[in-house]
């Protein structure tokens, strides 16, 4: 058990971070890495790194974000590698561009791993306290963060403040029709006074909600009635610094709801907090409660329920798929209607939690607020949902909070073409959100480039140049790049004719022209393993280098075209839009987009991109239209 810190030696910090969740931990560590004297304030030190909802990290798009956080020397990847008990790569039947690393975690092991990292971090102190307010000074005529006030009355001076409050900002828990309980998580008090302070400083707060399912007793489940779901035979670590997964691996299991389950839920919808107008705020669209599933999809006879162990030594199981705010007795009845759970014991009931968030359009791409200099938001306060989304915002907010202390440092901003984190932040600050925002591969225009395997190649050097990445990690990247370059050179120097290939049972276009080994990788049926069979000397390279170059070679022609598209897109960001443009003539533009553009009359592509509701696809259509218009004008002249 960690000692509680009641006092701190100094009363002034460069950066103060409020919240010890996934966003707060990454923000505090990032600020400390850049060199700022940083203080992390959390209401309970023992809850640092707590997985409030599902015991898992990663998934489709989300897993790429974890890799990106790790590439920037973040914490999440290292922590999950010490706690993973069921690891898998989702979408393995599809291309690497949509692979999604995911790991079930031992809750206690993850929390311990994160606390071990945070409590021993250089330049970072941790204080157990509650922040109730913050003050500002005027800097060049604009308000700027000056201090934070604790519930005990103590004032801490700081030049930069990161709020990563999660579901605690004005948090309220609901179960059934009972009166809501003020809490950010079951058993933990909310940050009510801080929410009022934000309002006093001119921020308009909205409300969102999320939910969690009951926890059930492992020993009361009839596992023979469920389907086993094994993890990957060789677990893949999240961190580029991890050699292997250390904990034993276990299976997850699948069962399904049925018509009886749905009847029980349907008969009690009027008693569920989420459906009884007690919590009339937006819920996560892509992680709905069982009440929402039954109501929105009446044609479905069943829904999957994933039974996920919460730890190697824990008797608690997380039934993923039945998040609920029904009364407790209804929750148990509903669970016992599911195959394999007929005699299940409930260890903890499910609930809905509603909380405050701020319209993320009030932020710059650095996640600094437009209203107050030095004030940054990260995580669910920006309208997102998910551990991974929170961590990605945390690392950007913390880094920029520290970098902004010096005029010699440029802001750390990730573009949509550079990272899923960049896609997410750009979506948030330009489009805003009216419901909990979640990342998907479909949100990224350049997902062929934004893969989980190359996050370090994309971001580590960028982070190193910003002072965010350690010499050790940069050295690992440098060595990896050197080996990959040697391998690519070897593949370009090695060639073979189609005729010789055919003798080996490999058939390509019989035009007589020699093909280099690297060019062969672009053939649909040729993999790096086949090249190794042809040229065994390639085995002298590491499996990591062979895998990375294999993917790059497979996608090489497409990546080259995409790189040209990205460069063209960036150049056209400042391209002017003629005042006489008719948006009704732009092919592929929705009526809604046409109306918004007509009203706003943006003068450039960049200005059009920042109109709420105008998607990247719409921008691409406008660019194509302007190109065609330009060519037609040139031909006519």
From Swiss-Prot:
Purpose of the protein: NAD-binding protein involved in the addition of a carboxymethylaminomethyl (cmnm) group at the wobble position (U34) of certain tRNAs, forming tRNA-cmnm(5)s(2)U34.
Cofactor(s) of this protein: FAD
GO biological process, one term: tRNA wobble uridine modification
MF term (GO), any: flavin adenine dinucleotide binding
SUPFAM superfamilies: FAD/NAD(P)-binding domain (SSF51905)
Organism per entry: Anaplasma marginale (strain St. Maries)
Assembly information from the UniProt record: Homodimer. Heterotetramer of two MnmE and two MnmG subunits.
Binding site for NAD(+): 283-297
Name listed for the protein in its UniProt record: tRNA uridine 5-carboxymethylaminomethyl modification enzyme MnmG
HAMAP family reported in the protein's UniProt record: MnmG_GidA
Recorded family membership: Belongs to the MnmG family.
Gene name per UniProt: mnmG
InterPro entries: FAD/NAD-bd_sf (IPR036188), GIDA_C_N (IPR049312), MnmG (IPR004416), MnmG-rel (IPR002218), MnmG-rel_CS (IPR020595), MnmG_C (IPR026904), MnmG_C_subdom (IPR047001), MnmG_C_subdom_sf (IPR044920)
Entries under Pfam families matching the protein: GIDA (PF01134), GIDA_C_1st (PF21680), SAM_GIDA_C (PF13932)
Primary localization class, coarse: cytoplasm
């Amino acid at each position: 058990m960690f000692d509680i810190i009641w006092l701190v030696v100094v009363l002034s910090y460069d950066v103060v971070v409020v919240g010890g969740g996934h966003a707060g931990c990454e923000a505090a560590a990032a600020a400390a890495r850049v060199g700022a004297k940083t203080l992390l304030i959390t209401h309970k030190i023992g809850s640092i790194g707590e997985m409030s909802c599902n015991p898992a990290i990663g998934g489709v798009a989300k897993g790429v974000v974890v890799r990106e956080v790790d590439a920037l020397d973040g914490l999440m990847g290292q922590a999950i590698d010490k706690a993973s008990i069921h690891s898998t790569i989702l979408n393995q039947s599809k291309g690497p561009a949509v692979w999604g690393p995911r790991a079930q975690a031992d809750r206690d092991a993850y929390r311990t791993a994160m606390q071990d990292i945070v409590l021993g971090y250089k330049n970072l102190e941790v204080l157990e306290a509650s922040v109730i307010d913050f003050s500002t000074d005027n800097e060049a005529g604009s308000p700027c963060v000056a201090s934070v006030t604790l519930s005990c009355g103590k004032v801490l001076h700081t030049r930069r403040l990161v709020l990563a409050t999660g579901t605690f900002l004005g948090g309220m828990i609901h179960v059934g029709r009972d009166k809501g309980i003020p809490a950010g998580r079951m058993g933990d008090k909310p940050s009510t006074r801080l929410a009022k302070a934000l309002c006093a400083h001119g921020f308009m707060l909205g409300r969102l909600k999320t939910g969690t399912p009951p926890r059930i007793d492992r020993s009361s489940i009839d596992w023979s009635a469920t389907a086993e779901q094994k993890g990957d035979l060789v677990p893949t670590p999240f961190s580029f610094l991890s050699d292997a997964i250390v904990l034993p691996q276990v299976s997850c299991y699948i069962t399904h709801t049925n018509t009886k389950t749905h009847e029980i839920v349907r008969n009690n919808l009027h008693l569920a907090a989420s459906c009884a107008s007690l919590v009339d705020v937006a819920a996560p669209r892509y992680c709905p409660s069982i009440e929402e599933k039954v109501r929105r999809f009446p044609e479905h006879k069943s829904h999957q329920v994933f039974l996920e162990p919460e730890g190697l030594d824990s008797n608690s199981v997380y039934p993923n798929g039945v998040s609920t705010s029904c009364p407790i007795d209804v929750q148990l009845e509903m669970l016992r209607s599911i195959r394999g759970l007929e005699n299940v014991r409930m260890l903890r009931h499910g609930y809905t939690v509603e909380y405050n968030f701020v319209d993320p359009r009030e932020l710059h791409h650095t996640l600094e607020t437009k209203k107050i200099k030095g004030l940054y938001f990260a995580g669910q306060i920006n309208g997102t949902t998910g551990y991974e989304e929170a961590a990605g915002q945390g690392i950007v907010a913390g880094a920029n909070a520290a970098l902004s202390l010096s005029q010699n440092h440029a802001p750390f901003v990730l573009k949509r073409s550079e990272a899923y984190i960049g896609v997410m932040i750009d979506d948030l600050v330009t489009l805003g959100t009216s419901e909990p925002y979640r990342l998907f591969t479909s949100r990224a225009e350049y997902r062929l480039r934004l893969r989980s395997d190359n996050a370090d190649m994309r971001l580590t050097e960028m982070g190193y140049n910003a002072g965010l990445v350690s010499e050790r990690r940069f050295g690992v990247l440098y060595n990896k790049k050197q080996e990959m370059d040697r391998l690519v050179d070897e593949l370009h120097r090695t060639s073979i004719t189609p005729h010789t290939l055919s003798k080996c049972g490999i058939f390509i276009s019989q035009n007589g022209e020699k093909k280099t080994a690297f060019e062969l990788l672009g053939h649909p049926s040729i993999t790096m393993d086949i090249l190794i069979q042809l040229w065994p000397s390639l085995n002298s390279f590491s499996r990591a280098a062979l895998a990375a170059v294999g993917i790059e070679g497979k996608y090489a022609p497409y990546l080259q075209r995409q790189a040209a598209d990205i460069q063209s897109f960036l150049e056209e960001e400042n391209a002017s839009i003629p005042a006489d443009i008719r948006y009704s003539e732009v092919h592929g533009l929705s009526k809604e987009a046409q109306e918004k553009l007509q009203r706003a009359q943006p003068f450039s592509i960049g200005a059009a991109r920042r109109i709420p509701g105008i998607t990247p696809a719409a921008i691409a259509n406008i660019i194509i239209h302007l190109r065609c218009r330009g060519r037609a004008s040139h031909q006519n002249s």
